[in-house]
């Protein structure tokens, strides 16, 4: 027994990233050697993702309400620069995707799509959906994982509790610590969950179905890599005036890898919250910016919408001028910010973007079907970029604010 405890302690306190890498390798090996067994352990991945999704809504609600209720007068949360970074980053992602699509034009072999969900008819419908999510029933928002609604109610409750007694505020603070402890335990299970996810994915698809769309995937993943490794670091450097890459690589390593395999920005919120805490960021800031980022910071979605739309344009032989391409970037960026309010996410916003070029809805839905075929990779990479950027921009804004306070005379 005395030997077992140190071993378990070493596992519990060991490097989570190394354990996740071991889980990935083990999952690939199991899928290669025994596909049936790999499929059977897929439930481990499902359990892990479900646990993250279950704890995320209550974590956001309690943490936001507690941080706002306990916020001291005159405290700054840096939310304005973070939101500006989110929006600017999403627009830059769409513009980068346009450039990549023109440099490496893609044509598609369209397939008959069986996507039964209805795409939105316009940006107004997307924005309308988001507005109604804000005034959702709080219980329903928690049950359905509607983070816009959860944020709205948590912020309102936090402000309402500003005048509450210290004892009441302490209760929320203690609840926040309790939920955070539960989240920390769930995150330690990531290696087991990712092992199940990887094993199941490799055993079921083998990625053979993706071979016919190698060029499209190369443009998609190339655009995301440019954003993650060139554009985002440039934005962070401009904001912080220091080497951005240590922070960039840490966000990719500790947030992006988990998000890649869970394929859910909502499920990755607890992971991002923990990373922000490890980075010693201000809780009043990240408790709001991280769930907000999971809703509106959608660089990956903007890339997906733009690349697949321009692939449809090239396939149909439609001529595109620079002005229309820029307009597409804006539409893709605005649509991407509303992607969380659409069933099917970024893929079902493709018909909306295709309508700019007069492409029939039937053809656009075939492009959506292609998106579902490559979704194993596309959705994973998109989520990894979206989620890791939430932490990156939050940290950049916090560091810039700290530097400004430390050197008030420097512009």
Swiss-Prot record:
It is a multi-pass membrane protein. One of its GO terms (biological process) is threonine transport. It is found in: Cell inner membrane. Gene3D superfamilies: Sodium:dicarboxylate symporter (1.10.3860.10). It catalyses: L-serine(in) + Na(+)(in) = L-serine(out) + Na(+)(out); L-threonine(in) + Na(+)(in) = L-threonine(out) + Na(+)(out). The chain crosses the membrane at residues 14-34, 43-63, 82-102, 141-161, 192-212, 218-238, 290-310, 330-350, 357-377. InterPro entries: Na-dicarboxylate_symporter, Na:dicarbo_symporter_sf, Ser_Thr_transp_SstT. The keyword Membrane applies. The keyword Cell inner membrane applies. It holds the Pfam family SDF. Keywords: Amino-acid transport, Cell inner membrane, Cell membrane, Membrane, Symport, Transmembrane, Transmembrane helix, Transport. GO terms for molecular function: neutral L-amino acid:sodium symporter activity. Disulfide bonds: none annotated. GO terms for cellular component: plasma membrane. Involved in the import of serine and threonine into the cell, with the concomitant import of sodium (symport system). Belongs to the dicarboxylate/amino acid:cation symporter (DAACS) (TC 2.A.23) family. This is Serine/threonine transporter SstT. The lineage of its organism: Bacteria, Pseudomonadati, Pseudomonadota, Gammaproteobacteria, Vibrionales. The gene is sstT.
